[in-house]
Each structure stands twice: as C-alpha cells, then as structure tokens.
Amino acid sequence: MIKMKIVNSILLIITLALVTSCSNNMKPEDFKNTKPSLLIEEYFDGKVKAWGILQDRGGKVTRQFKADLVGSFKDNVITLDEDFYWTDGEKQKRTWKIKKIDDNNYVGTAPDVVGEASGAQYGSAFKFKYDLMVPFKNKNIKISFDDWIFKQDEKVAINRATLTKFGFKVGELTVFFMRY
C-alpha cells in the first residue's frame, strides 16, 4: 500500500514536470518581420477601449470586463491610465509607467506590480512579464503574468496572457483593444 502511494506520487510529479515543461517557448524576436509594427508608445498614446475575459485553468470564463485606457508618451515614458469595469460591479484602476530602454526593450511599474515588469517589442508583437498583486478571498496574492499583445491593424490589438502561481497555470486573460 505504501509502495503504491510512493509510485503514484512519483508518477504525479513526473506528469506535472512534463506538463509544465511543455510551456510556450515563443520569443518576441520570432515576430521581428511581422506587420503591422506595434510600438506601444504609439498605440497606447491616446484613448483605447478594451473588452476582456478571465478564464480559470480549465478554460471556464469566470469574469468579464470593459476598460477605458488613456495613455501619453513623454521623455521615453508611457503613462497608461487604465479604468476597469467588471461585469460583477467591481471597478479597478491601474496606472502604468513604462519606460522605453532601447528600440526593443521596456521596463514598467504600477502600484500593484511587484518590482518591475519587463517588456520586449518586435514586429507586431509585444511581450510583457510581471508579477501582479491580485485580490483573492479578502487578501492579495501574487500572480505572474506572461502577457502578449499582437497588433492587428491601426486600431485593433489582441492581448493574450497566461497567469501562473508557483509555475502552475491558474488562468488566462484575453483582451481586445480598439483605439479611437
């Protein structure tokens, strides 16, 4: 009986290791020749509307939102004010400060981001990695975001984010952006 539990535990650990090692290995550089080019300092300079869904690790939609974003670019820094309106009535506000380091790299901060976010832009894609303090059951927990934005045309961009905790996927976020 004990040997069977040990074997089952080992099989579970191996399975989890295999599943987590099959993670997405896309790199921003993979998109260097794609069009239309996404420069976030241009795309988010002005007003942008957003609509999004949050899914749990099984794919079930757990929350939906609309958002108003207003950005400005000055002295190599994007200030992006985000106002979220969740369908359950919750309202959230976040202000990003994203600094352009060179032609392709960025760092960003926001009050609920732990440390600095790191970003890279190539072609039509922008990747942004950060840890966010998220409200959960009357406390805040740290969730890691692996965020990708893909520009579709001059007005439309699509955002896909994988959310992880301790390296395990806990959810996905899909956002549709429209400049106006």
Question: What are the roles of these predicted feature ranges?
Answer:
Residues 2-10:
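Bacterial N-terminal signal peptides that target proteins for export
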Residues 18-21:
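C-terminal motif of bacterial Sec signal peptides marking the signal peptidase cleavage site
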Residues 23-25:
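Bacterial signal peptide processing site
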Residues 31-47:
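N-terminal helix-cap/turn-to-beta initiation motif at the start of protein domains
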Residues 44-52, 159:
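A short, Trp-centered hydrophobic/proline-enriched beta-strand micro-motif
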Residues 51, 55-136:
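Central antiparallel beta-sheet cores of small beta-barrel/beta-sandwich binding domains
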Residues 61-67, 140-145, 169-173:
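Amphipathic hydrophobic-ligand
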Residues 146-147, 151-180:
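Glycine-rich, aromatic-bearing surface loops/beta-hairpins
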